[in-house]
Design a protein with these regions (language model features):
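Short, hinge-like loop/turn segments at secondary-structure boundaries
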Residues: 232-233, 297-301
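Short, structured coil segments at secondary-structure junctions
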Residues: 230-232, 276
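Conserved protein kinase catalytic core
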Residues: 223, 291-292
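Catalytic cysteine-centered active loop of the rhodanese-like fold, especially the PTP/DSP P-loop
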Residues: 242-291, 308
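Flexible, polar/low-complexity N-terminal or interdomain linker segments that lie immediately upstream
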Residues: 186-227, 299-308
Length: 308
């Protein structure tokens, strides 16, 4: 089945610092060209006799298939990353960036600097979720064939000249700044949620499975500050600073972390703890599900981080 081009998910006339002419040309010619090239390569592969085709020809076809496939997919992610104000994001998305980079601004600074460093050359800068560690990383890619094994790209910046030359000439830095001002964090967050849920699903604990485990409340600091209760015996730890407290936890004891609903905050924290060699799981349904089931809670103590 042939791949089909996807329409721009935003009004190209509405972006700041990126003209409709540039965006339409990029979409129609470069992205559209990648889709057409991929379909042509697939058609040729469908009629190829693998037994009689010389190895160098087959290698060439498969190499070009990879290049065209990633060009199509990364362009789709690039366009799907635009249409916002560059700043507005869900608190849980900000937490994920802070937990991985030390702060949202720090993440942005590194990402933009990586893009500007590619100016005059070519390649991509990607914000990628790495499931092994439950973290986010800004990934460098010199062309369409570089990828973090097992990672899920969430945000893409195209640094090939076709992405900016019509508007900015050789001023790649101005283009990067314009891109950063137009990022739509809502779909980035949705992709992050899906990636975290897929990676963490095997590590969920039901309410009946928490007995005997060390309980860690990892609700966001702002949410926890407004809370009045916790699970009995739990202690609070900041999910934005896992690397600062993970080493304090016992390696010979099962851990269960919980957030409000059992979504990406608790799940990503469990993944990070597991990457540190700990037997960590997240509580399915979070404290909300626990309370809805009529399970007991305790008042939040004066020192919620202390060992019970």
């Amino acid at each position: 089945m042939d791949a089909r081009t996807q329409a721009l998910p935003f009004d190209p006339a509405a972006l700041r610092g990126l003209s409709a002419q540039l965006l339409n040309s990029h979409h129609q010619n470069n992205y559209g060209g990648a889709v057409k090239r991929l379909n042509a390569i697939r058609a040729q592969l469908a009629t190829t006799s693998f037994a009689s085709t010389p190895g160098f020809q087959l290698n060439g076809l498969k190499r070009e298939e990879l290049i065209a496939s990633n060009s199509m997919l990364l362009h789709e992610l690039y366009f799907a990353s635009l249409g916002g104000d560059g700043q507005t994001m869900e608190p849980a998305m900000a937490l994920a960036l802070a937990a991985s980079f030390g702060g949202v601004d720090r993440r942005h600074e590194e990402f933009a600097a990586m893009g500007k460093a590619l100016g005059g050359g070519s390649g991509w800068v990607l914000l990628t979720f790495q499931p092994r560690e439950g973290t986010l990383v800004n990934q460098w890619a010199a062309d369409h064939t570089h990828a973090l094994a097992g990672g899920t790209p969430l945000l893409a910046l195209d640094m090939y000249e076709h992405a900016y030359h019509l508007d900015h000439g050789a001023a790649a830095g101005a283009y990067v700044d314009a891109f950063m001002e137009n990022v739509d964090w809502a779909p980035v967050y949705a992709r992050y949620q899906r990636a975290v849920h897929a990676a963490s699903e095997p590590f969920g604990a039901t309410q009946d499975e928490v007995a005997g485990s060390m309980l860690l409340d990892v609700r966001r600091a702002g949410v926890f500050a407004q809370a009045t209760s916790m699970l009995p015996g739990a202690r609070w730890r900041d999910p934005a600073a896992v690397e600062h407290w993970a080493a304090e936890l016992p390696a010979d004891r099962a851990l269960v972390v919980y957030c409000v609903y059992g979504h990406e905050v608790g799940r990503s924290t469990a993944l990070r703890l597991r990457a540190a060699g700990l037997d960590a799981r997240y509580l399915r349904g979070g404290i909300d599900g626990w309370q809805a089931a009529g399970r007991p809670l305790q008042p939040k103590p004066a020192d919620p981080g202390a060992t019970p």
